[in-house]
């Protein structure tokens, strides 16, 4: 028997974002979705690996996120890669748009999940791009932690 999913189990995670960017601050944003998109998300079908957040038209928009069509919705289905509006407080939107205009800073999608009330939420992060040296250091740290855990398991 499979174990039950927790309420905040992620539907989609952008693992590449934490490797390519240094996340300075995270925010929780709501998503303006259609009904067929919500049903598709509840099935766990979404991909935010290549998505990003853009400040345009009086708000923040999630661009290039792939939510596949929901099968039973037939002709009333949504467009898989349409732009989706993010729901944040006005002060948060102003802060993020101001910060993202600075050189080298961007807003990335980190994970997509349902909160305790069953609402679809997107965790976004204000990020700065990492240089190649930083990425190599991240790989070294990860390998060292794996090696430490193996040593502790065998000799600990």
UniProtKB/Swiss-Prot annotation:
GO terms for biological process: trans-translation. Keywords: Cytoplasm, RNA-binding. One of its GO terms (cellular component) is cytosol. The keyword RNA-binding applies. Signal peptide: none annotated. It holds the Pfam family SmpB. GO terms for molecular function: RNA binding. InterPro entries: SmpB (IPR023620), SsrA-bd_prot (IPR000037), SsrA-bd_prot_CS (IPR020081). It is found in: Cytoplasm. SUPFAM superfamilies: Small protein B (SmpB) (SSF74982). HAMAP family: SmpB. Belongs to the SmpB family. NCBIfam families: PRK05422.1 (NF003843), smpB (TIGR00086). Required for rescue of stalled ribosomes mediated by trans-translation. Binds to transfer-messenger RNA (tmRNA), required for stable association of tmRNA with ribosomes. tmRNA and SmpB together mimic tRNA shape, replacing the anticodon stem-loop with SmpB. tmRNA is encoded by the ssrA gene; the 2 termini fold to resemble tRNA(Ala) and it encodes a 'tag peptide', a short internal open reading frame. During trans-translation Ala-aminoacylated tmRNA acts like a tRNA, entering the A-site of stalled ribosomes, displacing the stalled mRNA. This is SsrA-binding protein. The gene is smpB.
């Amino acid at each position: 028997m499979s174990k039950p999913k927790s309420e905040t189990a992620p539907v989609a995670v952008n693992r590449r974002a934490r490797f390519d960017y240094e996340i300075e601050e995270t925010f929780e944003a709501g998503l303006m979705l259609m009904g067929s998109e919500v049903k598709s998300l509840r099935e766990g079908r979404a991909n935010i690996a290549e998505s990003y957040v853009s400040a345009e038209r009086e708000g923040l928009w999630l661009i290039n996120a792939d939510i596949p069509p929901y099968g039973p919705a037939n002709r009333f289905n949504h467009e898989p890669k349409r732009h989706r509006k993010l729901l944040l407080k006005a002060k948060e939107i102003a802060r993020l748009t101001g910060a993202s205009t600075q050189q080298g800073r961007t807003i990335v999608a980190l994970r997509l999940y349902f909160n305790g009330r069953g609402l679809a939420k997107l965790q976004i992060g204000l990020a700065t791009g990492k240089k190649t040296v930083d990425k190599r250091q991240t790989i070294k740290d990860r390998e060292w932690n794996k090696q430490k855990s193996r040593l502790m398991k065998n000799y600990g």
